[in-house]
Amino acid sequence: RLVYAANSRHALHDPAGIPVEVGALLGQSQPVAASLDAVADALDGGGCRIVLDASASEAVAERHADWLARGIHVVTACKLGQGGPLARWASIQAARRRGGACYGDSATVGAGLPILRSLRELQAGGDRIHAVAGVLSGSLAWLFHHYDGLRPFSNFVRAARDAGYTEPDPRDDLSGEDVRRKLLILARTAGHALESDAVQVDSLVPPALRDAPVAAFDDALPVLDAPMRERFAAAYKGGAKLRLVARLQAGGRATVGLEALAADDPLAIGGGTDNRVAIWSDRYSERPLVIQGPGAGAQVTA
């Protein structure tokens, strides 16, 4: 049963159980102030104790290790735990072992796709991971699948934003920072304990616009048109396709950037907002293991 539900401002607590439709209830009938300290207290008692973190909060991610150490299972789509500072990641691993609790992080990369599970099961079976590469952003997958080099790139960015594929501030997607966190999670899961700044990111946002107000960035979006048209033309001339690719190479080198891929490359195939990941290992050395499917959406993520 659900005994505690909270957003950033309000909380509901009832040991007898709360109706699942808590979204509407949190703004009604005398909710109490939300407190992260109250979460573990609300779960005192017997039975299977689980915290479901559907936030994107650094403060909540900082509590993951504490909950795990208390034997409370954590299920999350938040990338700030596994994809945050290395010390936080390490504390989560240690707390999970110490508390005997499970850390359900599959949805942090690829929504409902079995990407992290596959990496773990390969290694548990004695395989060694050599490299991982992927298209890990549904919004950027949509953007570069539809961009045709004829219409302005800025038009496609606005269309993706208006359709809800990007964040309200498209720089959150175009900067590659979200993909960087996902690649960190993949790398650490594959056995490379990388520091947060170890991933080299080639941002699509010009330096002059990285700190501009959202409205000013929207007005300045056309500055992306000419350089993107040139990159598209060069790729098209060679029969290639542009994709924003995250790569973990042998030795742990990690990069995120726009690449021109051969049309038959497993990362170039597919459309829409699909995520695609290729895994090379001892057993998948000549042809990679490829995982593909929807990388976003409430139902598959849940």
What are these regions (language model features)?
Residues 1-69:
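N-terminal glycine-/serine-/threonine-rich beta1-alpha1-beta2 phosphate-ribose binding loop
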Residues 130-132, 167-174, 290-294:
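A short glycine-threonine-serine/GTX helix/turn-capping micro-motif
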Residues 97-100, 104-166, 177, 185:
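Rossmann-like NAD(P)H-binding beta-loop-alpha module
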Residues 55-70, 78-122:
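Rossmann-fold NAD(P)-binding glycine/threonine-rich loop
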Residues 146-147, 154-269:
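Substrate-binding/catalytic subdomain of NAD(P)-dependent oxidoreductase enzymes
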Residues 34, 46, 87, 110, ...:
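Conserved active-site and cofactor/substrate-binding residues in soluble primary-metabolism enzymes
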Residues 133, 141, 159, 247-302:
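Catalytic, metal-anchored helix/loop core of enzyme active sites in primary metabolism
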